[in-house]
Regions:
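Short, Lys/Arg-enriched N-terminal segment that forms or immediately precedes the first helix
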Residues: 1, 143-167
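N-terminal helix-turn-helix DNA-binding core of bacterial DNA-binding proteins
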Residues: 1-31, 97, 115, 161-202
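Basic, amphipathic "hinge/linker" alpha-helix immediately C-terminal to the N-terminal HTH DNA-binding motif
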Residues: 3, 54-75, 223-241
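N-terminal alpha-helical interaction blocks
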Residues: 6-7, 26, 37-38, 43-46, ...
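Short amphipathic alpha-helical interaction segments
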Residues: 30-43, 197-212
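Short, solvent-exposed amphipathic helices
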Residues: 65-86, 236-254, 258
């Protein structure tokens, strides 16, 4: 559900305080047909609730399940402020990352950092090890990569929704699945093909896009054969992948996560929490102010 560019853009707009149908149309440039479809799915999947306003238009408000996506959007904000939006076309002002973040408890501007709950060490991408979780043997083929298999979007929708780098990666189910697989250590075309159950033509297209976006780089290692490795820009997306996993494990398959991560420095199963980079306190959604 959250691996869709329009869905992510709508949710981010709601987090920023815009909740009405007309707000989404005017600020996102989304067609009414696509907007109606995505809002219906967000309500059906209990991420949003349609709240009637006496004498006015209804509002779409975040449910507990929707509010729990705030750490993922925090990770997205962090990536965008460090790496830019990667503008392909003009990105509307409403979607530009706000430049500063304040922790209202200590009153300081700060950069958040993701720490291990057990050892309090800042989590680094290659200090983790993926392991089969309790639900590994029961998931449908092709979902071992932590994300559900992509449905076909129309080319028009995809083009309109994916205006910049982050949405082109996270907002496309196959691209986000490839990203997650790369963090698992997969590097070869055949490994991606087997793990994701993706057709060779589609895989070639997606790898080509991730190369063009600077998320992956190709390296020849045996004649004409290539392996695909994450760039620094791609590695920096690790907190986003972690938060997508965390949300899915909590709300989609509680107690039956298909994949778990072990934090190698402390040898515990990884549980991460965001902390203030200034006072080191654990952050909560209501204690963060973007401006």
């Amino acid at each position: 559900m959250i691996g869709d560019a329009w869905t992510l853009r709508i949710l981010r707009t709601v987090f920023r305080g815009r909740r009405r149908y007309s707000d989404f149309v005017s600020e996102l440039g989304i067609s009414r047909a696509v907007l109606t479809d995505r809002l219906g799915k967000l309500v059906a999947n209990e991420l949003l609730i349609r709240h009637a306003i006496e004498g006015g238009h209804p509002e779409y408000r975040l449910t507990e399940r929707g509010l729990d996506l705030w750490p993922m959007f925090l990770a997205m904000w962090l990536w965008e402020t460090e790496w830019g939006t990667g503008v392909m076309d003009d990105v509307p002002p409403v979607e530009q990352p706000r430049p500063m973040l304040m922790h209202t408890v200590c009153g300081h501007k700060m950069r958040p950092q993701l720490e291990c709950q057990h050892c309090s060490v800042v989590i680094q991408p290659f200090d983790t090890q993926a392991e089969a979780g309790p639900g590994y043997l029961h998931i449908e083929p092709g979902t071992q990569s932590m994300f559900r298999r992509a449905s076909q979007n129309t080319l028009a929708e995809a083009s309109a929704a994916q205006a910049h780098t982050l949405m082109r990666v996270i907002g496309d189910r196959w691209n986000s699945a490839l990203l997650a697989a790369a963090f698992k250590g997969l590097r070869l075309f055949s490994e991606f093909e087997k793990d994701l159950r993706i057709g060779p033509n589609q895989l070639s297209d997606r790898l080509g896009e991730l190369l063009k976006l600077g998320i992956l780089r190709a390296r020849s290692y045996s004649g004409a054969r290539q392996e695909y490795r994450l760039t620094r820009k791609g590695v920096a997306m690790f907190p986003i992948v972690l938060e997508m996993m965390r949300w899915g494990d909590k709300w989609l398959w509680p107690a039956t996560a298909p994949i778990v991560l072990r934090h190698k420095p402390c040898d515990h199963l990884l549980v991460g929490h965001w902390h203030c980079g200034h006072c080191k306190m654990q952050l909560s959604r209501t204690e963060i102010h973007l401006f």
